[in-house]
Amino acid sequence: MTTPASSTDASAGDVSQTAVLSFLAGGRPNLAVQRIDTHCSIIFLEPSRALKVKRAVKLPYLDFSTLEKRRRACEDEITVNKRHAPSIYRGVVPITRERDGLAIGGVGPVVEWAVEMVRFDESETLDRLASGVLEPELGDDLAAVLLDSHRVAVIS
């Protein structure tokens, strides 16, 4: 599925990140997409999957200012999170420029990268679970996972 590319940005060939975000948000026919903005990413929830794009920003604590840095950040996210949620994290997918517009996973030049995930039931998010009764075991399990993650974390 493609949509015409517009705007220019040297960091993504000749396609701006704004054009990519517009394409992912609604540039594909017959696909309902919900957009969630965070301070460093934009997540697009489709019926069966989620695509997460890193914002083209440089902050004191992270640098996603180039296409290559965003690709590496997506790959790092997959590496870290696939250990704990292998059934959710699918991989990194390119957003490409094709003759007739933008495509997800196309063969043309890459203009952006996204983390591809399986969309899970929103009733299973921690904020929704926290509005009910949380069992102490959940906290213990979460603490163990976090401790293990810190033990194996790469320090740069």
Task: Describe each PLM feature range.
Residues 8-9, 43:
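Serine/proline-rich low-complexity intrinsically disordered segments, especially terminal tails, linkers
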Residues 1-7:
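N-terminal acidic, proline/glycine-rich, low-complexity intrinsically disordered segments
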Residues 15-156:
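Conserved ATP-binding subdomain of kinase catalytic cores across diverse folds
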Residues 12:
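Short, surface-exposed ligand-recognition loops at beta-strand->loop->(often short) alpha-helix junctions
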